[in-house]
Amino acid sequence: LLYSAYVETSFLKLIHTPKAFTESEIIQIMAERNLEQKWLKCVDLAFNKLNTTNLGEVANKKQTLHRLLQEYIIDPSQIRNKVAHGQWVYCLNNECTKVNHDTTALMANLDFVKIEKYFCIYDKFHQCILDLLISHRTHYRDYY
């Protein structure tokens, strides 16, 4: 729960970073339906700010960040939702008609080391997006 709260709070901080997004872009991001769509819009808008002609490189970086987003932000947020709805031992599917074995296994295998790994990877992910927004010419230097 703490990890997901940290991610959601730092997301809000990120999109409101001075000179990162315009007011119009922030409204576009916040208008998205759910956390996943908001993050995807944020990443896409961040890449739109780059002045590069190497579209293949941009596509590869965007794909990598989308994969990290899914694995280290969206999937853990779904586990948080299960815990918040009292599904501590057995996680149900979205319709609550049967057990979701994949999510149940993810929940059962959570430990301190994995959660610490989530925090570390998220911090790097967050910094990548921030660098795209703030350091247009040197964003690639530290992480990729």
Language-model-derived ranges and their functions:
Residues L1-P18:
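Short, hydrophobic, well-ordered secondary-structure elements
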Residues L1-S4, E36, H66-I73, F112-I115, ...:
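Amphipathic, non-membrane alpha-helical segments in soluble helical-bundle scaffolds
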Residues V7-E8, N81-A84, H126, L130:
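Structural signal for well-ordered, non-membrane alpha-helices
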Residues F11, K19-K82, G86-N93, T97-H101:
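Flexible secondary-structure boundary motifs
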Residues E71-Y72, Q87-Y144:
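Polyanionic, low-complexity intrinsically disordered segments
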